[in-house]
Amino acid sequence: MFKKGFTVTAYLFLAPFLIAVAIFFFYAFGRALYYSFTNFDLFHPPQLIGLKPYRDVLADPFFQRALANSLVFALVTTTLQTIFALLMSVALNNRLRGMAFFRSAWYMPSITSSVVITLIFLWLFQRRGVANYLITQWQAYQPLILTFLGVFAAAQMVQVLWERARRLPAGWLDPALAAISALVALLLTWALNFTGVIGVREVPPFDYQYFADKWITLGGVKVLSIPLLVVIIQNTFTTVPTLMLFFLAGLQNIPRALYEAADIDGATPLQKLLRVTVPMLRPVTFYVVTVGLIGTMQMFDQVAVIGSAAPRETLITLAYYVYTNTFQAGAAPVNMACAAAIILALIILAMVFLQRRFFVAPEANS
């Protein structure tokens, strides 16, 4: 009797969630699937017309560009955010004083509204934005910067070779030697600037339009637009902190004995990362990549906020294509929007299936 009552109570608590899923997922998916085979346009009752909406969608140049943009965006962004999230989690996994503060600080971009972040990036990459300003300053101060870096590298090399000649341990990035090299480079650069040998150059303001119709091409084929590249940078910036938490949780489950054994064998930090950390985090990496692919293939809000600030072809994604076909003036081709949404769902499903089939660790299947 107690077990039966307990089961009923559990289902009562689950009922609101199950009802919401049934209405907003299964029912909505069923309606979208039905409309994708009709001529529905919001003004006339739907009539079945077979696969014509799918043929129209696949033949639409904007859909083809949206599909290409979505695939490139998903592959590039997922790769970048996975790599940076892993490296950041390894860096923040050290037991140092104040590490909790840095973990919280690095997580801030993920709790900030994506709309706000998009507006900030629009400001950063406008024609008179911070990006162009920094490039202008780099061009103006390039002689001083290159001189400083060259003197620093030379001084560091001389010090390291001198210490090793005296049979003393010295690394190329030894902090004490690096401080001396930086001081020498700073003094010499100042002296050369003071005597007029080198100095700040007069350069025109760097004027690059990041949200124009500009593309990175491969063999004459448009691969990645510059506006979409800006969105990739922004999306990576906002999603890395969240994915970092998954890697941090996975790092806690790696036995310390493995790292101790690697230290005994004389493994370098890079070897420990590639031979110990990465293999042990493979199930977590599968989850991170899966979440990343699903999220990036459905990316919509950043493109919607940018809107007309960039040409439509440079930023349109599958999710934005569905939106623009659903909410437009006149008889909106909702059937084409539904067909595109079904195709997007099938692509995501295929990606996850292939990844689970070929790239997941055996432990994740158990």
PLM features per residue range, with description:
Residues 61, 65-73, 90, 110-111, ...:
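Start (N-cap) of specific transmembrane helices in multi-pass transporter permeases
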Residues 6, 41, 56, 61-62, ...:
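Interhelical loop and adjacent transmembrane-helix boundary motif
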Residues 5, 18-62, 69-71, 124-129, ...:
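Short membrane-interfacial helix/loop motifs at transmembrane-helix boundaries
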